[in-house]
Amino acid sequence: MASESDTEEFYDAPEDVHLGTGYPVGSPGKVGLLSFKEAENTANQAGNESPVQELRQDVSKKIIESIIEESQKVLQLEDDSLDSKGKGLSDEATAGPSVAGTEFSNIPGLLAIEHELQQDSEKAESQNVAEESELETQKCFPSDETCEKSEKTVDETDNLTEVSSGEQLDASGLEAETLNKEALEVKEGDVLDPASLDTLSTTDFAAVEEVAPAKPPRHLTPEPDIVASTKKPVPARPPPPTNFPPPRPPPPSRPAPPPRKKKSELEFEALKTPDLDVPKENITSDSLLTTNMASENTVRDSLPSLDLASATSGDKIVTAQENGKAPDVQTVAGEVMGPQRPRSNSGRELTDEEILASVMIKNLDTGEEIPLSLAEEKLPTGINPLTLHIMRRTKEYVSNDATQSDDEEKLQSQQTDTDGGRLKQKTTQLKKFLGKSVKRAKHLAEEYGERAINKVKSVRDEVFHTDQDDPSSSDDEGMPYTRPVKFKAAHGFKGPYDFDQIKVVQDLSGEHMGAVWTMKFSHCGRLLASAGQDNIVRIWALKNAFDYFNNMRMKYNTEGRVSPSPSQESLSSSKSDTDMGVCSGTDEDPDDKNAPFRQRPFCKYKGHTADLLDLSWSKNYFLLSSSMDKTVRLWHISRRECLCCFQHIDFVTAIAFHPRDDRYFLSGSLDGKLRLWNIPDKKVALWNEVDGQTKLITAANFCQNGKYAVIGTYDGRCIFYDTEHLKYHTQIHVRSTRGRNKVGRKITGIEPLPGENKILVTSNDSRIRLYDLRDLSLSMKYKGYVNSSSQIKASFSHDFTYLVSGSEDKYVYIWSTYHDLSKFTSVRRDRNDFWEGIKAHNAVVTSAIFAPNPSLMLSLDVQSEKLEGIDKYEDAEVLDSTSTGIVKTDNTEVLLSADFTGAIKVFINKRKTVS
């Protein structure tokens, strides 16, 4: 068992090594005289007078002679008394001042003197600590022969005593210091010479107790042992038994901590302005994404991609386990069992009405508090369930007044009708009633002919206040029974216009039951995915590409063939009515020659249990869908079942495939965590958490070709992370400098602008902003549309010339990405108020996108000539050939929009050529 002195020895070892080299190795006589002078000085300070001093002077020479004689006798002793030597060695470890010689009659006197000196040293420790240390140090070196014998004796008995490791007399200072500390552990009255004690037998100790010679005078030494002098004498430990194991070595020294950075360096790093334009050499090649991927992205084969084998292997349901750590039991129980229903004080479960009535929502404008059960009637029209859920979480009330302008110019009035507000209020109910009548009349139009059509038009014009002389409100010849497009432009925008001749070529209404929250085109532009409130993902295929995708589906989905070990959810999904799109293209209405899509979905994917919020396509036709059921599901166009389900802790608001490696995808959730998933490994590769008071991720995407991951938050922040390690890089606070919107509002969409290091950010302050990532500056602000509470997001056209967005005022808004200075004499280069509006819906336009390849959606006559070889394609890479480059098709744009009722409209616009 280690004592206090052993613990101190470990920490003091470095000092002993340093001090041990300074001991002088002199002659035995010189060392002895110095020790006696030290004893004399100490005795004089303690008050010991002349009787003791005379006795010391008479005995000093005898002690020196006895030491020399004893050293000669040591060599002749036999090893017949090992036990007595072991005991003597244990006592030697606790010995005090040296006493040697064969005249044992003087030893009792010396013991008495040393006892007084020990008491005096405790009273005046600060005066004689140096003297005692030198005396104890020199006692270990009485003569050369004695030292050699002492070392030999220690080596023989090191397995019998705990202190044997400290008795090996070495010239180095470490062994000397160890011996000095052990020598301080003295039993009171036991003062034995460590050098001569090795030669004493058991019968010698009785004689030692009878003799008490006077202690010779000591001399001061100029080099005291400072470390040993600081040790106070403690009671000696009893000798260990014979079979006691050797002592354990001291523990290794602790490693030094890394050097801390200076305060000035930390302040300098904090003041550095982050820049997103980091050279590619900074990315290591042994990490998740290598640098050479960016240089080889033109070669499709060199890029890693996701295949069906890796997507279907492993678990079908993956939980959000960050870095291999399983979530806690409460989290797993919450995901499996769902949230627990609140209970009353008596233990009864509350009903839905009671729960809604217990939640209060405050109107920040009026200060009025209303229960959530009544708030739905007073909420803005077209509010989506995600916004309603966030309002419950944040206890906020979204006001229509939040769309007011924060700039010097006021927003143009959102009233699109020419009559006053009173007249509009009176005709609101009439619109709803006559809207149904218009639909009935359209179905009867074929029977009653042109007269019925004219009557329907007159009723429609009366309800919607359209001008019959307006060319934009007239029906198109090739599109019978399609409601025309109403066009408008900004007040100060006098033309020429680019979208005043836009036409509706197809109406895909009737499939979605409820609002359509998101729409996404595949990279090739031949498939459209739409999803929303009815929990179903629908895939729409172009007419001229239907045969190709149908053959692909039939190839992988023969009779009874599905993915290996499908989950229960995928089994129910595989039973969905995906075979409804197997019918050939001849079943389509022959009158809809200008319609680019088949009127019925190519397939439907069922499996989600709540509203779908976002979609994402990969280059090889994998599709991700995120939902308010806290899951992300993976699909493939050739399969009918769900390939994998990635579970989250909260609503998944945004997802995005990695643009260069579709084995990974990004997901943002309302739990405040950004996750980078590895699809083949079925786990979370990297993750990070948003800091701040409001940890709600509402948008997410990649920028700079996957170099950075960027997310949008509920409080108006765009936070950038490097994709390689998903570490924080920088952030932008999306807000106005003054006015109502100086506080950041919810980010609803983030779109990169390739080739220019810019991103397009949509927010709930009815603004769209274009930021330059090189210096995080605002390049352009677009306004004119209304987006106060919806998840509406803006997107670019196929050639990035225009951007489009839906709006809560039932219009589709289009802006030029940059100002055409030939149209304007004086205009702010960082403001774009010159929008063009299109109205073709009767409800909030929740989504609006441009087609990535408009050349595929021209009339069937032209397409049959350009794409007659589509059935000869062997793989999907050929279909993607046109998506790699920008196709300029004689100023033609294809636009799609969806609304709150589930209607989907397809527009084609042919711009006027300026000669």
Curated annotation (Swiss-Prot):
Record region (Binding activity): 2-173
Presence of keyword Translocase: no
Pfam families: WD40 (PF00400)
Gene Ontology MF, one: small GTPase binding
Low complexity bias locations: 563-575
Chain positions found as N-acetylalanine: 2
Biased composition (Basic and acidic residues): 146-155, 264-280
Protein modification: Phosphorylated by ATK1; the phosphorylation stabilizes its interaction with RAB11A and RAB11B.
Region named Disordered: 1-24, 79-102, 117-174, 208-282, 399-425, 461-481, 559-593
Each WD repeat, start to end: 511-550, 607-645, 647-687, 692-731, 742-781, 786-825, 840-880, 882-915
UniProt subcellular location: Cytoplasm, Cytosol; Cytoplasm, Perinuclear region; Endosome membrane; Golgi apparatus, trans-Golgi network
Region of interest: Important for interaction with ARHGAP26 AND ARHGAP10: 213-259
InterPro entries for this protein: G-protein_beta_WD-40_rep, WD40/YVTN_repeat-like_dom_sf, WD40_repeat_dom_sf, WD40_rpt, WDR44/Dgr2
Known partners and oligomeric status: Interacts with the GTP-bound form of RAB11 when membrane-associated. Interacts with GRAF1/ARHGAP26 or GRAF2/ARHGAP10; the interaction connects the endoplasmic reticulum (ER) with the endosomal tubule. Interacts (via FFAT-like motif) with VAPA (via MSP domain) or VAPB (via MSP domain); the interaction connects the ER with the endosomal tubule. Does not bind to other Rab and Rho small G proteins.
UniProt name for this protein: WD repeat-containing protein 44
Organism name: Mus musculus
Organism placement in taxonomy: Eukaryota, Metazoa, Chordata, Craniata, Vertebrata
